Amino acid sequence: MAHTVQTLSKLLKKTPDEVVTILANAGVDGKNSDSVISAEERKILMSSLSKRPIRRSSMSVFRKAGTKSNAVSVSDVKVKVRSKRLTQPITMIDEQSKVVANEMARAALAALDAGRNADEILLAQDARRLEMVRLQKAQVEVVEIQKETVKKVQEKEAEKKVEKLKTADKPKEGNKPKRLRNTSSDNNTRKQLHVARHNPNRRLKKKDRTHLSQKIQAEQAQHAFQKPIEKVIHEVAIVGNIKVTELAQKMATKAGEVLKVLMGMGVMVTLNDVIDQDTALLVVEEMGHKGIISVEETIEDVLIEQLKYNEHESARPPIVTIMGHVDHGKTSLLDYIRQAKVAHGEVGGITQHIGAYQVQSNGNIITFIDTPGHAAFSKMRFRGANVTDIVILVVAADDGVMPQTIESIKHTQIVGVPMIVAINKIDKEGTDVDKIKQVLSTYDVISEDWGGDVIMVPVSAHTGEGVDALLDAISLTAEILEFSAVSEGPAHGTVLEARLEKGRGKVTTILVQSGTLNKGDIMIAGFEYGKVKQIVDDKGKILKLAMPSMPVEVLGLSGVPNSGDEVIVVGSERKAREVADFRKSKDREVQLQKQQASKMENFLMKMEKGDISTVNVLLKADVRGSAQALIEALEELSTDEVRVKVVSSGVGGINNTDITLAATSSALVLGFNVRADAVARKTADNEGVRVEYYSIIYNLINDVKAIMSGLLSPELSENIIGIASVKNIFKSQKMGDIAGCMVDEGMVKRDSLIRVLRDSVVIFDGKLESLRRFKDDVNEVKSGTECGIGVLNYTDVQPGDQIEIFERVERARIL
């Protein structure tokens, strides 16, 4: 096989130009990288590679080491130690590498002539090269060991020389002078003899300078404590609310430093106070660490994970919520659909709690939820929108779009449920349906007639006109959306309403959203738990179970839960108690944190504006939803000068304990659809506690507003009653300067407040001291009359000035 210069250069580990140069030096000219090399020319190339240049440095394998001297000082004697002459090998790595490379190239050519494959030759070369590198490393290590050995020998010889010198300097035993205990040239002084403890003849240990000792010292220095140069950044995991001390411990810092940061942020707390997760994250970032929001798996989470549901879902009735402004006919429309008279039973003709009913229309079951329209029941409407599938927005054709109508639209858009607009009261004269559609379109509620996606149905709750069309629209929407839920397994739902009822106890209205609620199930609702003793539907019929989309009344809970609380059925009462206790403990932490924040806020407000007037209120209502709505409405009445504080609230009648608490806290007792018992009434009379009863929510709110208005400081206003021009100044020994004036407008009264104006600028604000007409003192002077005015504590009145006479009037302020 013919080989080119290029091929041979790869085998020889040389460039093609180097191969061409070697051939030219051997007498083979005219070659380039692509030229073919014959067998004869390869032999010439092999012969050229075998000729190695002889250099003097390569002939001497060993040379004598140079002489090294170590100087050692012992007291005043300096000793110079000359080490032995040793021989050590000198490795000529570069020259040997060249020799080995030439030998490998020559071997490659020989193998090529023998007919071996070029790839095999390359592999053999790589193996031999690796072996050569290994041998070179071993040879270098041998040299280092030899150097180390020479160094140790030199150090030992130096130590021996020093030992001999020390021995020579010691005096002999016979010539050793006697040491007397107290002999001295001065009798008053005493010589002290310092000897080594335990062993007087012991020499001080010399510092070990061996290689091993130095290595150990280096390792000890490496592992010794070093003050950190850079600040350590911690990753701090924050799970919910956290104590200040615990947060400081996680950041490995002092709690006082954390308090300083919190004070800088305007948060006034102590070491044992609890701060919320957001505040803790800000503190961590402010102190240069990295905050991580961590979610701790609680007992509640574990319990919910253990609940097993059947994955098979079946069709369920749609849940429809009726929303809108107060007095727009929501309950009346639902009454017509149910063929009932609920609206007549509502006090004041307005709904004040959530009502839930099931209606059968054309063979289809529909669940209706009626919500209050009054402004105070905003949270109730939002709860209704959260649990619903379809919203019926009722708009009165005569009133049009009102504030609660707009609020209901926003609630629906936030939740993202379909909406059907029922334009009610079309039986009245002068109604304009198109105008209502136009106003609704400004809130992105566009009718299908106008190219939108919202069904709008004109109806009349009085005559029943359009009600069937409304029910058909509901059924059509439900059919399109195909509402379904898991019907087997533990029940899951929401508390719509809760109350205390005489003879029945705690009654909770819930809406089952999935699963099946059976009599005897263990149920958790908010902070309350218990065994389901009785299930009653909206018609008063006792049931054994409740399916999805059914609103039912349940008896058996330990207390009255809040409206909107989640309802879960669990396996045992013990687990239910654990979850309820866990929720109560978390709620206590939140309430404590709110109280701390409120105390600090009140303290700061008092520092800025003085004391704030407070109206203390103790509230009792018939149902939990009404109590929650009233608390929110009353707290919204608070201003910077006067605020409402609900010291206690509850569900049920007013008892003696409530009156005692009200007397202690100087609170006004408000009963909404409840009354005080005989004992409570007697205690209230004895303690002087004011008790008020209400059945309409806005009457209660208006009365509290009036009480708050009475605590407001009066508003001061100024009424200008006259203006007089100064014509001349008269001197009086008794009265001082008297301004002779002409009354231009109104009148001037004795003892009135005045202002002196010069060039329309107020230069003095004071009181009128004297008023005379000629030489007589008068009480008042009317317009167009001259008079003399004496100004109290002011003598700089000049002709041309104006005197403005005014009075301050206090006016009661109203919220």
UniProtKB/Swiss-Prot annotation:
Residues 153-176 have a biased composition (Basic and acidic residues). GO terms for cellular component: cytosol. Residues 349-353 are annotated as: G2. Pfam families: EF-G_D2, GTP_EFTU, IF-2, IF2_N. Residues 315-482 form the tr-type G domain. Residues 324-331 are annotated as: G1. Its main location: cytoplasm. GTP binds at residues 324-331, 370-374, 424-427. It is found in: Cytoplasm. Residues 370-373 are annotated as: G3. Residues 424-427 are annotated as: G4. Keywords: Cytoplasm, GTP-binding, Initiation factor, Nucleotide-binding, Protein biosynthesis. Residues 460-462 are annotated as: G5. Signal peptide: none annotated. Residues 191-209 have a biased composition (Basic residues). Residues 153-219 are annotated as: Disordered. GO terms for molecular function: GTP binding; GTPase activity; translation initiation factor activity. One of the essential components for the initiation of protein synthesis. Protects formylmethionyl-tRNA from spontaneous hydrolysis and promotes its binding to the 30S ribosomal subunits. Also involved in the hydrolysis of GTP during the formation of the 70S ribosomal complex. Belongs to the TRAFAC class translation factor GTPase superfamily. Classic translation factor GTPase family. IF-2 subfamily. This is Translation initiation factor IF-2. The lineage of its organism: Bacteria, Pseudomonadati, Pseudomonadota, Gammaproteobacteria, Candidatus Pseudothioglobaceae. The gene is infB.
